[in-house]
Amino acid sequence: MSHVELQPGFDFQQAGKEVLAIERECLAELDQYINQNFTLACEKMFWCKGKVVVMGMGKSGHIGRKMAATFASTGTPSFFVHPSEAAHGDLGMVTPQDVVIAISNSGESSEITALIPVLKRLHVPLICITGRPESSMARAADVHLCVKVAKEACPLGLAPTSSTTATLVMGDALAVALLKARGFTAEDFALSHPGGALGRKLLLRVNDIMHTGDEIPHVKKTASLRDALLEVTRKNLGMTVICDDNMMIEGIFTDGDLRRVFDMGVDVRQLSIADVMTPGGIRVRPGILAVEALNLMQSRHITSVMVADGDHLLGVLHMHDLLRAGVV
């Protein structure tokens, strides 16, 4: 396209709002297509013993990829297959235990219609999503989901806009309906998103990130305050645990306790750790979620916490560990 000048006074905001208005109207009309066919499609996907295989060409293919990804992350195993690649060997990935969702606004995609006889021969259930109930794909489908729109938001009526939005929303409707039917939980979602923030919050446990072994700052009750301070400095966690030879907790001493000792105006060189430690101390179990430990630490205004099984010291968790793990 050759370079053109911007029309004086052209209103980009108005143009954008017109698109939103058109697509809102189209989505409102989509409600009529959440019907018995929608129920049948959901049932086929719910009882599918294999995977939901999504196909689509061009823009429908882009929507199909997103649809498959949404299914897969919400409890419905799914993957995308490009129709052209399917015709040259990738159809071998499809089994009779699967369900195929084929997407085409016109319902006449030659790449997909060429695959339908093979899918029928394999007895693979076929769900077609099109904008034309009278199309070849709609008539060949076991279940047809209509996503017909009154007009595209593109003023030329050429670029897929309203139609792709309608298809995307229909896919979301299928995914969320199945999610609810399966009783899919946030914890289930986290299992497929271990690298995301939600995954870290719902999967990461204290024993995954706590300090253990030689990294644990600890001294005996008979230690001097000086020796305890050296241990605090060496381990760099802002605290030390006071425990016996069997790692049974007797108390804790933090940098906050040290400030209080200085405020007392006593000779710190003459003190033992037993004189200034806090008996007992707050602790958490190793198997709790890291985010639970974070909530406790924030509510108690502490930066570190002991990890223990009863009184037996197992580790120490610091706020910095939670930050590094991405829990905060």
Swiss-Prot record:
Residues 42-184 form the SIS domain. Pfam families: CBS (PF00571), SIS (PF01380). It comes from the Bacteria. Keywords: Carbohydrate metabolism, CBS domain, Isomerase, Lipopolysaccharide biosynthesis, Metal-binding, Repeat, Zinc. The keyword NADP does not apply. The record marks 59, 111, 152, 193 as: Catalytically relevant. Disulfide bonds: none annotated. The keyword Phosphoprotein does not apply. Zn(2+) binds at residue 82. GO terms for biological process: lipopolysaccharide biosynthetic process. Its EC number is 5.3.1.13. Substrate binds at residues 75-76, 82, 88, 114-123, 148-150, 222, 275. CDD domains: CBS_pair_SIS_assoc, SIS_Kpsf. InterPro entries: CBS_dom, CBS_dom_sf, GutQ/KpsF_isomerases, KdsD/KpsF-type, SIS_dom, SIS_dom_sf, SIS_Kpsf. GO terms for molecular function: arabinose-5-phosphate isomerase activity; carbohydrate derivative binding; metal ion binding. Gene3D superfamilies: CBS-domain, Glucose-6-phosphate isomerase like protein, domain 1. Homotetramer. NCBIfam families: kpsF, PRK10892.1. This is Arabinose 5-phosphate isomerase KdsD. It comes from Shigella flexneri.
